[in-house]
Every structure is written in structure tokens, then in C-alpha cells.
Amino acid sequence: MAEAAVASTVTLPVSGGWTKHVTCRYFMHGLCKEGDNCRYSHDLTNSKPAAMICKFFQKGNCVFGERCRFDHCKPTKNEEFSSPQMLPPSSPSPSTDPESSQPAPRPKTQDWANAAEFVPGQPYCGRAESVKVEISIPLIEELDCDAAVDKEALRKQLCPYAAVGECRYGINCAYLHGDVCDMCGLQVLHPTDNSQRSQHTKACIEAHEKDMEISFAIQRSKDMMCGVCMEVVFEKANPSERRFGILSNCNHCYCLKCIRKWRSAKQFESKIIKSCPECRITSNFVIPSEYWVEDKEDKQKLIQKYKDGMGRKPCRYFDEGRGICPFGANCFYKHAFPDGRLEEAQPQRRQTGSSSRNRLSEMLLMLLAAGD
């Protein structure tokens, strides 16, 4: 071992080391940042690798064109098959040799035990014997045919870059650049696929209508003022408070925070706190909304959407049948048992005389408030 170590140290050159005999792979790609200080060789005269040839150009679909940093040269067939060991052996006639029907043995993968010994600090020499690869001419022709088919398939697909903005490859792009949509202004319409064009146009119109609805809602809501705090809801300092509390039975404007605070007061009866602070009309619930809604049809859609959303959430008071919900059948939340069964609606009880008197007193209070 000592003699081998001495021999290895003697074979190394004094200046530069063994790395000067290895071509810098970053320099071969034009990306070496070390420059003249690089430990590896920057001499490409005797180290032009096959990897420098652009494999996409050989297939006929290199999108970089003249800007590609690899060589755009396709080797001739004489160069590809100049070595006799690369060609498949000619098969004898089946009539003369009875053993010709037997399948030819497949080349075995080289055993790892035959690999060259690895010495730390020394360049790796690879395996002791080179692996012979047999490639047939029909296989190369088949690959060329597949490349042509792939290129033709790419020309039928819309360019993903042009579909979202601008494609930097321009006319050299391997993909198809679609027609410009009048709605979104993007190149997303296939020139020949009418179904794709109609589907995109329909989706664009729906998105445009939705954007217009949001624009109208913002225009309708930006100047609305809360009737309790007297602040413009869209101009509140805290962004989380820029929400409206829509009453189900009247069109007076309140922010969600103020109307919830009003309805959570404990010193008044239930009917009083459920009534509007201005018109005294009772609303059984408040709908949170990002935009102000006043139209009757739009309010009904908002109420139905709110009820559907609440109906998918389990009621914490019902607690899967273990508790009692004080709201009963009027609860918007889901009353379901552990097995998935829904609670049956209980029949409503008839109002007693005391409840009727309470309603009359509340109506008198409303009339007095209206007279003031």
C-alpha cells in the first residue's frame, strides 16, 4: 500500500494537479465563474464532448434557435454507424442453420465487481471495460419519426406562455399561438377548434358579468353610512369591520359590529332588540355581507345563500341530540344526530294570551316612537 501511495504521488504533476487534465464542465457550457483561477482545464481542443450537441435540434424542435448554447449539428449516418460494433450482427438464413430460430442472447450488464478501483484524490477512471451498445438503424429511423410526430402534436397545442401574456419565442415557438380573445385580450382561441372557442367565450362572458356585478356592488356600497356609529362602512379604520349587517325586513344601513351589539343588549325585551333602531320593524336575523344589498330580489338571494351556508354547519346547542336548541325549528344550523338523521320539525305551539298582550304593547311602543 505504501508503494502504491508513493507511485500515485509520483505520477501527479507538480503544478495544477490532476484536475488540469479534466475539462471544466461549467466552461463547456459557458458558465464557469472562476475564469483563469479555475482548477480544471479550459482547453476544448481535445475534449469536445458529445453532450455539447443539442439533442432537441436533432429531433427538430429546439425552441432557442440561434440563441441555443449547444451545437446545432446533426451527425451523419456514416459517423453514427462507422464502428462495426455498433451495427447488429447479420442473421444467417433460417434454412441453412437449424439453431437460427433460437433468440439471440441479450447483452448482460457489466458486473459492478469489474469496476476500477477508486482511490481518494485521484480522478475516477470508470469501469475496467467499456460497455458495448448495439443500436439498429431502424431504431434511429423510428426515433426520427416519433420526433416528427411529437413536433406535429406540439403545433396543435396552444402555447401556455402566449395564453397568459406574451411568448418570448415568437414565431420560433414550437407551440401554436391562438387568436386574441376580444373579452380578455389573450391569445387563447384555437384557430380550428370551434368547441374550444365557444367554451372560452362563454367562460369569458360569465367572468365579465361577475366582475360587473362586483363593480356595481362596490359602487353601491362605497358611500353607505352606519346608522349607529355614523361612519362610512367602507372607510372604517379596521378592515375587519368593513362589513354590513343586513336586516331581513328593512333597508336601513348598519355595520355588522354595531347591529350585533344592539341586538345583544340584555336590558330590553327580545322583540325590542330584534327591531330596527330607526323604523322599529322586527327582523328575526341579521345577514353579514361584504357589500350593501337593498334590492328585494338581491336580498332574497343573499338570505337564501346565508341559510344554505348555515345549514351545513352543526348546531352547537343541539350537539347531535345531546342538548336542546333554544331556537327550535327557527334555527338555521344543522340539527343532525350522530348517525346522520335530521331532527324532525316540532309542531308550533299556539300563542297564549300573555304573548298577545306583549305584542300589543310592542305595537304601542312602535306607534309612540313613530309619533316622536
Curated annotation (Swiss-Prot):
Residues 181-208 are annotated as: Makorin-type Cys-His. Pathway: Protein modification; protein ubiquitination. Gene3D superfamilies: Zinc finger, CCCH-type, Zinc/RING finger domain, C3HC4 (zinc finger). It catalyses: S-ubiquitinyl-[E2 ubiquitin-conjugating enzyme]-L-cysteine + [acceptor protein]-L-lysine = [E2 ubiquitin-conjugating enzyme]-L-cysteine + N(6)-ubiquitinyl-[acceptor protein]-L-lysine. Pfam families: zf-CCCH_2, zf-CCCH_4. GO terms for biological process: protein polyubiquitination. GO terms for molecular function: ubiquitin protein ligase activity; zinc ion binding. Residues 93-103 have a biased composition (Low complexity). Its EC number is 2.3.2.27. Keywords: Metal-binding, Repeat, Transferase, Ubl conjugation pathway, Zinc, Zinc-finger. SUPFAM superfamilies: CCCH zinc finger, RING/U-box. It comes from the Eukaryota. InterPro entries: MKRN-like, Znf-CCCH_4, Znf_CCCH, Znf_CCCH_sf, Znf_RING, Znf_RING/FYVE/PHD, Znf_RING_CS. A zinc finger (C3H1-type) spans 20-45, 48-75, 153-180, 309-338. A zinc finger (RING-type) spans 226-280. Residues 78-110 are annotated as: Disordered. E3 ubiquitin ligase catalyzing the covalent attachment of ubiquitin moieties onto substrate proteins. This is Probable E3 ubiquitin-protein ligase makorin-1. It comes from Tetraodon nigroviridis.
